[in-house]
Amino acid sequence: MDIGDFVKLELENTTYSGTVMPSLNEDTVVIKMKSGYNVGIDKKKIKNIEILESGDKPKYGLPPLNLEKNPKLKNISILSTGGTVASRVDYKTGAVHPAFTADDLIRAVPELMDVANIKGKVILNILSENMLPKYWVMTADAIKEEIENGAEGIVIAHGTDTMHYTASALSFMVNSEVPIILVGAQRSSDRPSSDAALNIIAAVKAATEPIKGVYVLMHGETGDTVCHLHEGTKVRKLHSSRRDAFKSVNETPIAEVNPFTKKVTYLREVKSQDRSKIKEVVLNTNLEEKVALIKVYPGIDSEILKFYVDNGYKGIILEGTGLGHTPETFFEGIDYANENNVLVAMTTQTINGRVNMNVYSNGRELQAKGVIPCEDMLSEVAFVKLMHLLGNYEFKEAKELMSKNIAGEINESINLEC
């Protein structure tokens, strides 16, 4: 028995005939009788079901908008990987569904029609905590396809939990002349405080700018006045629930974007695009997944490092204390990693500031054991960078490149106002 079938349902003392309708409860059969009334029947009370006539399952949906492209606007592709910003709510069931056809987007955020010609595509539908390195590769491949097919800017709708990891991965993997903007939402579209619509408007606007590179766009403060555009390798989620959870670290944001006036105010120098190469995309998606990120803490045991080495890991990022330190009791594990050609690099768990392993004897001894200081790199960025380097270079060259700036991840000096 399927939706659309005309059926006869026999109960203990009566029968009902009608067309099977969608039901919000899997234990209830709903039919529309010839009288026009709907009736719901508990499946347990049905003694027999007779299909009198098979029907076609009805197709639900709004008619297409049939919008024509505006030749004065740029063509922007919005790729959905899932998350709060990439969904709409079914108020009958409470279910959340992906909403990323172009028509879905325009119906949800009609202001987009004045910003760009929109194309929507779902490439993943996952919660961002379930993001995997192979999905970064899928996303990079989708970006390349869209650009080669005429997209002049890319917006990636992403869950916020791991969005900074993906931004970092794409920064190392994708070399193109178009802006690639990752956008999320902290509050779902059914909540009055939702940031989804304004973030998408601002992200699409940013994607029309004559810049290149990978960026994250989110609310710039708790109100609705401005959104901030952050460099993909210098941004981190710093609050679990606030709408302005994402902040640039050791750097100022690239720009402020007003989602109402569509004004973009640049706050520092930006990478300008070369329009003559707008369809050229170079991908390098090789990743070594056997890389770990370990937070250093008082009493940490060398056996932890030995575990990773013995299980075939090729690289370790240590999130050290202060300027980049570990307890001396951890040195044995570092020696073991070095003896087995496992690349070990150091970031700081203070988040702000930079590693300086020349100040104290602990840091100097760690360097003598082969630990690479990661300057002012964020731990998550260093983790992704090491995956990228070990996936593309031999050990010696990867070690040399770890402390060199490749995709904006290292600042020579830090603005004290950041």
UniProtKB/Swiss-Prot annotation:
InterPro entries: AsnA_fam, Asp/glu_Ase-like_sf, Asparaginase/glutaminase-like, Asparaginase/glutaminase_AS1, Asparaginase/glutaminase_AS2, Asparaginase_C, GatD, GatD_N. SMART domains: Asparaginase. GO terms for molecular function: asparaginase activity; ATP binding; glutaminyl-tRNA synthase (glutamine-hydrolyzing) activity. Pfam families: Asparaginase (PF00710), Asparaginase_C (PF17763), GatD_N (PF18195). Signal peptide: none annotated. The active site is at T84, T160, D161, K237. It comes from the Archaea. Keywords: ATP-binding, Ligase, Nucleotide-binding, Protein biosynthesis. SUPFAM superfamilies: GatD N-terminal domain-like, Glutaminase/Asparaginase. GO terms for biological process: amino acid metabolic process; regulation of translational fidelity; translation. It is an enzyme of class 6 (ligase). PROSITE patterns: ASN_GLN_ASE_1, ASN_GLN_ASE_2, ASN_GLN_ASE_3. Residues 74-405 form the Asparaginase/glutaminase domain. Heterodimer of GatD and GatE. Allows the formation of correctly charged Gln-tRNA(Gln) through the transamidation of misacylated Glu-tRNA(Gln) in organisms which lack glutaminyl-tRNA synthetase. The reaction takes place in the presence of glutamine and ATP through an activated gamma-phospho-Glu-tRNA(Gln). The GatDE system is specific for glutamate and does not act on aspartate. This is Glutamyl-tRNA(Gln) amidotransferase subunit D. The gene is gatD.
